[in-house]
């Protein structure tokens, strides 16, 4: 059984924790914004600065794609949008028109109509984590790590994860796949299949 010390060391969320976080984010006066913000950040592995700088022009709802401007000299690229992301974006963008400075180029606005800051994003995620009853201290970068671990757990190729997250150095990506216990499943069965005189 994992204790609180283990949870403090863990810097990613499990599938069920992500679901709880999204459910908590989808409440309150800014539910549409906070849910969309959290969902996109997890699905695409956004850094806080990247999601806060997301522009309206980066999103094409008809083509169902989003352009990711990676920071820290990462590789920028275009990602497909899932249907639930398209719906979340449509919901938020329709409500966004009632915010001050709705003509702004930035996708996510504060209640005063300013571009959402990293500090505000941190507060949103931290508050959602608390409302979800999660035992971890939640911060935005955990969503990026959660994306990497989720892809690795699904057996996605390391090189593809590297491109998806915009890593220039694959060593940053290997960290996700190296922690995936699933890659070892059946390893002894495969070994027995290759050797006539197996030990086990």
Swiss-Prot record:
GO terms for cellular component: Holliday junction resolvase complex. The keyword Acyltransferase does not apply. GO terms for biological process: chromosome segregation; DNA damage response; DNA integration; DNA recombination; resolution of DNA recombination intermediates. Residues 8-189 form the Tyr recombinase domain. The keyword Transcription applies. Gene3D superfamilies: Intergrase catalytic core. One of its GO terms (molecular function) is DNA binding. Keywords: DNA integration, DNA recombination, Fimbrium biogenesis, Transcription, Transcription regulation. The active site is at 47, 72, 141, 144, 167, 176 (o-(3'-phospho-dna)-tyrosine intermediate). FimB is one of the 2 regulatory proteins which control the phase variation of type 1 fimbriae in E.coli. These proteins mediate the periodic inversion of a 300bp DNA segment that harbors the promoter for the fimbrial structural gene, FimA. FimB switches FimA on. NCBIfam families: PRK09870.1 (NF007370), PRK09871.1 (NF007371). Belongs to the 'phage' integrase family. This is Type 1 fimbriae regulatory protein FimB. It comes from Escherichia coli (strain K12). The lineage of its organism: Bacteria, Pseudomonadati, Pseudomonadota, Gammaproteobacteria, Enterobacterales.
